Amino acid sequence: MQSQKPWLAEYPNDIPHELPLPNKTLQSILTDSAARFPDKTAISFYGKKLTFHDILTDALKLAAFLQCNGLQKGDRVAVMLPNCPQTVISYYGVLFAGGIVVQTNPLYTEHELEYQLRDAQVSVIITLDLLFPKAIKMKTLSIVDQILITSVKDYLPFPKNILYPLTQKQKVHIDFDKTANIHTFASCMKQEKTELLTIPKIDPEHDIAVLQYTGGTTGAPKGVMLTHQNILANTEMCAAWMYDVKEGAEKVLGIVPFFHVYGLTAVMNYSIKLGFEMILLPKFDPLETLKIIDKHKPTLFPGAPTIYIGLLHHPELQHYDLSSIKSCLSGSAALPVEVKQKFEKVTGGKLVEGYGLSEASPVTHANFIWGKNKPGSIGCPWPSTDAAIYSEETGELAAPYEHGEIIVKGPQVMKGYWNKPEETAAVLRDGWLFTGDMGYMDEEGFFYIADRKKDIIIAGGYNIYPREVEEALYEHEAIQEIVVAGVPDSYRGETVKAFVVLKKGAKADTEELDAFARSRLAPYKVPKAYEFRKELPKTAVGKILRRRLLEEETENHHIK
């Protein structure tokens, strides 16, 4: 199957159609930028400034520490951190040591964490002191061998580093003297063992850099194997698309979580490669973000619709100057047209929608920032990327405006799923990645999402898998049947709703089910609404009609 690539005629002259295939490691971009911009600020974190030389030095210290403690090439290291300097240092440090970074969400429950770490066969976990109880549980279960603990205060400037412990609501005591193989990040940084570091030989095309966990139709998380070449190719595509910038001179607002592959590529790797300053925020708070933009003047602001909506709806918006922002690439969920228009009016910059998935490192499409863009569209394929609409009915590529499954091809497409050859074969066919998203392409090569083939709920930029939520709630003794679906939400795009049938004579209310769900699921996966029914709509063979429930919900939403 070969597409005609009509989108190339729409490319601005500054964007190349094809890019050279990168044949170097991911960590080489840090080495290169540290050589070009040694004294330039790479990270700004609540007043703390770290240069590119600082980041490289600390990453090499961590790499040496990991090797001295037994890490071998290909060993998996879980990085369970919010956006902070240690996240960046850990990422490149693990890569310098020859390890594989396992992206781990700090919001995971112990149950979710255990599954991922067992599946990836992780040997080391790097995490916050506040998350130590989860980490030590994994060590007690013999899932991980070593724990590396850090604190937000480790990279705060004086006097914030002194005051921070006093403001913590949660106090965690860690006895480092009596517990073997538990180390502090700070002590690691004090050791001068970089001369002991042996940089392993890496094959960028085949060696895995990152295991990025994602779900599927079954809800069972799978490790997406992303090679050095996969991620670096996507980073270079990002640089080519965002061409109207000056290397070493931009500031990027780092709110999108780096444990999400979008933040990893479009913020962290992109900024490191081009010598940009990253202004890091561990979590999104609308007022704090407005203050940061007003004070630090970021020029680039990758995000998700919920972030932009949160800023636009804040009552104090008019008191802050957002005019420094030149361009924003929105991902993770559909960007409402009115949000795009209002945000561009407030900032004077450009806000465009893109599209991607973990299996593609992640970006495959975006609207042109300095060129034609179509509100409601996910845009055109990036350089060196092919895309098409596949018709299941004909087994051929669909014509313009014909609906089908979006398929993509390019150097950013994953190597496969970790230890799951059958699932890999199901989505990688004849060189194409079958995304599971349904849509169409217009005559100019702009693509549109029409529906989610997988019943994934995208709420606030997070992917939530109904089956996973259903299975967690099915453990409640009062539940007979349950189906979870994404329903319209003006802020999050979609939100999680559970339709429940209780066992005869059993009793349970919303509060009880909510508490039960919170004990088993990360907060963003917990249903925000419950509807109790006597029965659920089903087919003749007993399959629950999720689509029927969604249609009813959509009708009710429109009526409201």
Curated annotation (Swiss-Prot):
Gene3D superfamilies named among the record's database cross-references: 3.30.300.30, 3.40.50.980, Luciferase, Domain 3 (2.30.38.10)
EC numbers: 6.2.1.3
Catalysed reaction equations from the record: a long-chain fatty acid + ATP + CoA = a long-chain fatty acyl-CoA + AMP + diphosphate
GO MF, any single term: ATP binding
Matches recorded under CDD domains: FC-FACS_FadD_like
PROSITE patterns attached to this UniProt entry: AMP_BINDING
Disulphide-bonded residues: none
Enzyme class: ligase
Annotated keywords: ATP-binding, Fatty acid metabolism, Ligase, Lipid metabolism, Nucleotide-binding
Domain of life (superkingdom): Bacteria
Keyword field contains Heme: no
PANTHER family (UniProt xref): LONG-CHAIN-FATTY-ACID--COA LIGASE (PTHR43767:SF9)
Family designation: Belongs to the ATP-dependent AMP-binding enzyme family.
Protein name: Long-chain-fatty-acid--CoA ligase
